[in-house]
UniProtKB/Swiss-Prot annotation:
Protein keywords: Cell cycle, Cell projection, Cilium biogenesis/degradation, Cytoplasm, Cytoplasmic vesicle, Cytoskeleton, Developmental protein, Differentiation, Phosphoprotein, Spermatogenesis, Transport, Ubl conjugation
PANTHER family (alphabetical): CENTROSOMAL PROTEIN OF 131 KDA (PTHR31540:SF1)
Induction: Up-regulated by the transcription factor SP1.
Record-given protein name: Centrosomal protein of 131 kDa
Organismal lineage: Eukaryota, Metazoa, Chordata, Craniata, Vertebrata
Region named Interaction with PLK4: 1-250
Biased composition (Polar residues): 68-87, 138-148, 232-245
Length: 1083
């Protein structure tokens, strides 16, 4: 179906009209299918400013005729209206749609604005591989007449568009690395020598990217039920290019039918929707698993951060970021200088060529043209590589350049979050690349108003734009997942939405091996510079080809007339004026873009500062809570220490009181004993005095009698000597008694003092030792905990860094195969977490209950033992006092016995001479004295026995007190061991809890290894199958060769037989002819 339509307008919007905006969430950059849209090698990050100059030239080349491919694409999502081709006069004042601007809301509702508006001469930007979509406003004069005449009436048309974001080389995420890998792979797989002009058929596709998209579509069809994608996006590109070529005026160019194009576009949209839905489901599952794992490891992370300083991690991260930023800026500066020099050289060459081309038409009449004439269609069709490259350049242009004019009515209303902040060097780089691409695109067709169809670049951009829109069947709100280290990589804060891109396909493991991506710090990579240079070269070649084709296709006339020369001069003047105007507009656009980028930079800096301040506040709160918890623990330890010291002091006070009571009782017993001894001494002295006086009186009587008998002098001598002896014995006895009493009292006091001092020293030494040991244990435990936490924090930081790096490397290859394993891991980890939590709670409650019971029992036992000890102490003191009294009595008795025996011996010796006279009286008196003394001795022996018993009791009490002290010390040591065991159990539980992450990580690595082993086995099986298939193909080839050889032999044999038969027939004919000829004899 052929036809033309006005370029400057699109179908009017009706309730059932065409609305190509696939409503829904605008997919992020790295998930969009723009990277797989062309067959040309994909360049990682190439920016193009689709300025007004190239669009005006394309319009002048395409003329009023609309492209059939654009009609087909615009009818792809409409069910009630099909745009019919229409013809009209060319309207050069109305700009064409270079990018089909469409609007999508996160809620999935239908937008009130039409899709028909497009950027005008102010220029438009379009980004493919960025993280965030950018919106820009369009001037009011950029709208076509049909869009302004829409039946929406006074309803305001919103022109803010969420364009595909820009993927520059400063994107340091894994998506950038995957994009580089895909770029390098496609560069290596598709060299420029393999490129060929596209076929006219719409089924022509690029084999590798088609396989990639089919692989992703097959995986998506498992959950959605859609069929296999029959055609590739590149086929849509070829179809658009072929349709463009067919509508430019060449006679009888073959085109695809409308139904086929609609069916193909519908299938592409369905496949895109399926893949997006499937990937979104997978992203949700991964996010849920990551959240559960994060919740599981959150407690451990808090323990890891509790002893670190408030700003240690943040300062380290800022230092690393500053160093990385410096290196990146230096590299960017060098690369920009090189790119600026090359672009300046290219521009100088282009300006020189343009000046020679402008001076050329008066000399070559074939290059002159009448302003109203149409040019052939070859002027608009550059090389296929150039077309594909232009599409890629347009896809990668920065989306931050607004196309606002004086009459702007459209304000940016993008709901998505602003794009990641770029430094000024990156913005300068993007603007430089866009300016270069805009200058390169100026070498397109020289005129804009004389062609019949739109260029293939616009159709490619429109097709990619339709494919990159989010489908309206899954309006899902965004969910931002911020991990612990999300502030460390603010560039990659955009959530992972789903789309059909080479990045996703590479992450799902559908791409084969490809080289390593460039390092993250490169701002202007070699691939980008090479792509810019190759694009400039191709554009120069295409411009030269266009000039050649103009020279070849132009019919020479008899000679240029003055009218033609004047028209050409006026045309060149108008073109130069238009170029000057467009340059001015481009300069205004760039100035606005620079201002917007500055505002955006300031806003992003403020947001980053706010996020960092919030995170710093969270960390400060966390550290303060940790410090408060530790201070509370230290206060609890201090309180426990105070309680123990108070208990110890109470025990010491009780011991002191007992000692004081004991000393008081000893003093009382000694005083009583002294009183009793004094009474006994007084009684003994009185009785002895009475006895002595009586004895003296009797002796005096006897002496008188003896004196009477003549013995008086001798008796007087004996009496005098006896008195002296008695006085001497009395003095000795009194001195010995005093000495013995003094020695006994001194010895008792000395022993009591020694015991008291020894007890005090032992108490002080034990208290000091206990305090020192407790302090050393606490200090050692505190140092060990700090060291262990520091080591564990460092180890976990290194492990987290290594784990992130390793997982980032492995996730690109294994994510599609590991979804089941991750779900199982999440279930097992959640079950294990619940079991461990329940077990830990149970153990903690049991430990607390057991500890409380043990404390209660220990308190009761301590109270009972204290009471028993007090009772035993009193008994021992009484026994000791009795023993001491007995000992004193025994000593007194022994001294007294000695004194009595001495007195008896002296008296017997003294009375030896008077024995005969006083024997009877002396014997009777001795008997009386012996009886009396024996009674007193028996009493003293009884008192001595009592004192001995009391002393033994006191000794037993002292031994019991020492045993009690030893037992209490043993109990203290036992409690310390129990406390150490509890601490060991606590440390073991803490280590088990810390090792939980390691166990989960080990299990995950084991499963990864198993999945890798399965992958290797599958690859080996695939290799065997391929080898078997190759062998079978070789066998078939061999059989075909043998069959062909046999056929050739049969044909050759038949040919020889045929030749022999022909020879035989010729021979027979000759013979027959000879027989027919009459013989000469017959004549």
């Amino acid at each position: 179906m052929k036809g033309t339509r006005a370029i400057g307008s699109v179908p009017e919007r009706s309730p059932a009209g065409v609305d190509l905006s696939l409503t829904g969430l605008p997919p992020p950059v790295s998930r969009r299918p723009g990277s797989a849209a062309t067959t040309k090698p994909i360049v990682r990050s190439v920016s193009v400013v689709t300025g007004s100059e190239q669009k005006r030239k394309v319009l002048e080349a395409t003329g009023p005729g609309g492209s059939q491919a654009i009609n087909n694409l615009r009818r792809s999502n409409s069910t009630t209206q099909v745009s019919q081709p229409r013809s009209g006069s060319p309207r050069p004042t109305e700009p064409t749609d270079f990018l089909m601007l469409f609007e999508g809301s996160p809620s999935g509702k239908k937008r009130p604005a039409s899709l028909s508006t497009a950027p005008s001469e102010k220029g438009a930007t379009w980004n493919v591989l960025d993280d965030q979509p950018r919106g820009f406003t369009l001037p009011s004069n950029a709208r076509s007449s049909s869009a302004l005449d829409s039946p929406a009436g006074p309803r305001r048309k919103e022109c803010t568009v969420a364009l595909a974001p820009n993927f520059t080389a400063n994107n340091r995420s894994n998506k950038g690395a995957v994009g580089n890998c895909v770029t390098t792979m496609v560069h290596n797989r598709y060299t420029p020598s393999e490129r060929a002009p596209p076929l006219k058929s719409s089924n022509q596709t690029a084999p590798s990217l088609n396989n990639i998209i089919k692989a992703a579509t097959c995986e998506g069809s498992e959950s959605s039920g859609f069929g296999k994608l029959p055609k590739n996006v590149s086929s849509a590109t070829h179809s658009a290019r072929n349709n463009t070529g067919g509508s430019t005026g060449l006679p009888r160019r073959k085109e695809v039918t409308e139904e086929e194009a609609e069916r193909f576009i519908h299938q592409v949209n369905q496949a895109t929707v399926t893949i997006q839905r499937w990937y979104r489901h997978q992203v949700q599952r991964r996010g849920a698993g990551a959240a559960r794992l994060e919740h599981l490891l959150q407690a451990k992370r808090e323990e890891q951060r509790q002893r670190s300083g408030e700003g240690t991690l943040l300062d380290l991260h800022q230092q690393k970021e500053a160093a990385r930023r410096k290196a990146r800026e230096e590299k960017a500066r060098q690369a920009r200088r090189a790119a600026i020099q090359e672009l300046q050289q290219k521009r100088a060459l282009r300006a020189q060529k343009a000046s020679t081309a402008e001076r050329g038409p008066p000399e070559n009449p074939r290059e002159t043209r009448v302003p109203g004439m149409r040019q052939p269609a070859q002027e608009l069709s550059p090389t296929p590589g150039g077309t594909a490259h232009q599409a890629l350049k347009a896809n990668n242009t920065g989306g931050g350049l607004p196309a606002a004019g004086p009459g702007d009515r459209c304000l940016p209303t993008s709901d998505s979050s602003p794009e990641p902040q770029q430094p000024p060097e990156d913005r300068t780089q993007d603007v430089l690349a866009q300016d270069a691409a805009g200058d390169n695109l100026e070498m397109m067709a020289p005129s804009r108003g004389s062609a019949k169809s739109r260029g293939p670049l616009e159709e490619l951009l429109h097709t990619l734009q339709l494919l990159e829109k989010e489908p309206d069947v899954l309006p899902r709100p965004r969910t931002h997942h911020r991990g612990r280290y999300a502030w460390a990589s603010e560039v990659t804060t955009e959530d992972d939405a789903s789309s059909l891109t080479a990045d996703n396909l590479e992450k799902f493991g559908k791409l084969s091996a490809f080289p390593e991506p460039p390092e993250d710090g490169t701002l202007l990579s070699e691939a980008k510079l090479q792509s810019i240079m190759s694009f400039l070269d191709e554009m120069e070649k295409s411009g030269q080809d266009q000039l050649d084709s103009q020279q070849e296709g132009w019919v020479p006339e008899a000679g240029p007339g003055p009218l033609e020369l004047g028209s050409e001069v006026s045309t060149s003047v108008m073109r130069l004026k238009l170029e000057v105007e467009e340059k001015k507009q481009a300069m205004l656009l760039l100035q606005r873009a620079l201002a917007q980028q500055r505002d955006l930079t300031a806003r992003r800096v403020k947001e980053t500062e706010k996020a960092l301040s919030r995170q710093l506040q969270r960390q400060r709160e966390h550290y303060e809570a940790t410090i408060q918890r530790h201070l509370a623990f230290i206060d609890q330890l201090i309180e426990d220490k105070k309680v123990l010291s108070e208990k110890c002091e109470a025990v010491v006070a009780e011991l002191k009181q007992e000692d004081q009571r004991c000393t008081e009782r000893v003093a009382q017993a000694q005083a009583q004993h002294e009183l009793e001894i004094k009474k006994l001494k007084e009684l003994m002295s009185a009785t002895e005095k009475a006895r002595r006086e009586k004895w003296i009186s009797e002796k005096t009587k006897k002496i008188k009698e003896v004196t009477v008998r003549g013995l008086e002098p001798e008796i007087q001598k004996l009496i005098a000597r006896h008195k002296q002896e008695v006085r001497r014995l009395k003095s000795l006895h009194e001195a010995e008694l005093l000495q013995s009493d003094e020695r006994a009292s001194q010895r008792c006091l000395r022993q009591a003092e020694e015991l008291r001092e020894q007890l005090e020293r032992e108490k002080e030494a034990l208290g000091q030792q206990e305090r020192e040991r407790a302090r050393q244990r606490f200090q050692q435990h505190l140092e060990q905990e700090q060291w262990a936490l520091q080591q564990q924090r460092q180890r976990l930081y290194s492990e987290v860094a290594e784990e992130r790096e390793r997982l980032g490397q492995q996730a690109a290859r294994q994510r599609a195969e590991l979804e089941e394993l991750r779900q199982q891991l999440e279930e097992s980890s959640s079950a294990l977490t619940r079991a461990l939590r329940a077990e830990f709670e149970k153990g903690r409650e049991e430990q607390e209950r057991r500890h409380q019971m043990e404390l209660n029992t220990l308190k009761q036992q301590l109270e009972l033992e204290r009471q028993a000890w007090e009772a035993g102490r009193t008994r021992k003191e009484e026994a000791w006092l009795l023993n001491r009294e007995q000992e004193l009595r025994e000593e007194i008795r022994k001294g007294r016995d000695k004194e009595i025996e001495l007195v008896i011996h002296r008296l017997e010796a003294d009375m030896a001479l008077a024995k005969e006279e006083s024997e009877k009286a002396a014997e009777s008196r001795i008997k009386r004295l012996r009886d009396k003394y024996e009674a007193e001795l028996s009493e003293l022996e009884q008192s001595e026995r009592k004192l001995q018993e009391r002393c033994s009791e006191l000794k037993g009490q002292l031994g019991e007190a020492e045993g009690e002290n030893l037992r209490l010390q043993g109990l203290v040591r036992q409690k310390e061991r129990a406390l150490e065991d509890a601490q060991a159990v606590n440390e073991q539980l803490s280590s088990e809890r810390s090792n939980l992450a390691q166990v989960i990580r080990q299990e995950f690595e084991d499963r990864l290894a198993a999945s890798e082993e399965e992958t290797r086995q599958a690859k080996a099986e695939l290799a065997t199958l391929q080898a078997r298939q190759q062998l079978e193909l070789e066998e078939v080839h061999r059989r075909v060769k043998t069959a062909l050889a046999r056929k050739e032999e049969a044909v050759s044999s038949l040919r020889t037989q045929h030749e022999a038969a022909v020879k035989r027939a010729d021979h027979l004919e000759e013979l027959l002819e000879q027989h027919r000829r009459p013989t000469p004899s017959t004549k």
